């Protein structure tokens, strides 16, 4: 990553975010700018989309790292924003893509993510979750045209994230 590239971290929604989780610590050690969901207990899709658009527009180039609900945000944003060309790549960890009909009622401002190939290279790193099964995460990876390494233990997740971070040229061999 060059000096003109910004790493943007889109964490999970506040109910499920774990500030001490290794993924969050990893993003912070890489100098990531946090673009977090502010609404609690109901995450607001529109508010977070505006924050992401502003963050991307303020950077000449950026990489996105998203976890859980943040992955749905990236997909929704890429479907409408013309700023996607500033994104070098995206790392999507354990995607969770609810819609307004989600049984919890917490996602009433969210719409179903439009199944489409993302306009930038991406990796989906699977993460076991009661909200999003691995098979569903693999389906999102295929839909988005993302590299899918298969199920990984936590050590494998960290290795995959480091590979994505350190070797952009290796990523392009997957696309």
Regions found by a protein language model. Give the residues of each.
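Conserved alpha/beta-hydrolase fold motif
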Residues: 63-66, 90
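Gly/Ala-rich beta-loop-alpha elbow adjacent to hydrolase catalytic centers
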Residues: 65-74
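Glycine-rich phosphate-binding loop signature in dinucleotide/nucleotide-binding domains
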Residues: 2, 55-60, 84, 168-175
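C-terminal catalytic histidine-bearing segment of alpha/beta-hydrolase fold enzymes
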Residues: 143-175
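Active-site catalytic motif of lipid deacylating hydrolases and related acyltransferases
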Residues: 2-61
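Active-site signature of alpha/beta-hydrolase-fold catalytic machinery across serine-
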Residues: 76-80
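A conserved short beta-strand
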Residues: 84-100
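The feature captures the conserved acid-bearing segment of alpha/beta-hydrolase catalytic domains
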Residues: 98-145, 149
């Amino acid at each position: 990553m060059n000096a003109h590239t910004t790493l943007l971290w889109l964490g999970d929604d506040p109910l499920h975010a774990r500030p001490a989780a290794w993924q969050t610590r990893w993003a912070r050690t890489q100098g990531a700018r946090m673009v977090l969901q502010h609404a609690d207990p109901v995450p607001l899709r529109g508010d977070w989309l505006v924050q992401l658009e502003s963050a991307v527009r303020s950077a000449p180039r950026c990489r996105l790292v998203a976890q859980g609900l943040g992955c749905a945000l990236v997909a929704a944003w890429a479907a409408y924003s013309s700023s996607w060309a500033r994104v070098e790549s995206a790392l999507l960890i354990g995607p969770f893509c609810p819609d307004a009909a989600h049984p919890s009622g917490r996602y009433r401002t969210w719409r179903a993510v439009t199944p489409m190939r993302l306009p930038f290279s991406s990796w989906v790193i699977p993460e076991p979750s009661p909200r999003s099964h691995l098979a569903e995460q693999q389906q999102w990876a295929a839909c988005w045209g993302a590299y899918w390494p298969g199920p990984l233990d936590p050590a494998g997740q960290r290795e995959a994230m480091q590979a994505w971070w350190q070797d952009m040229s290796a990523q392009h061999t997957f696309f």
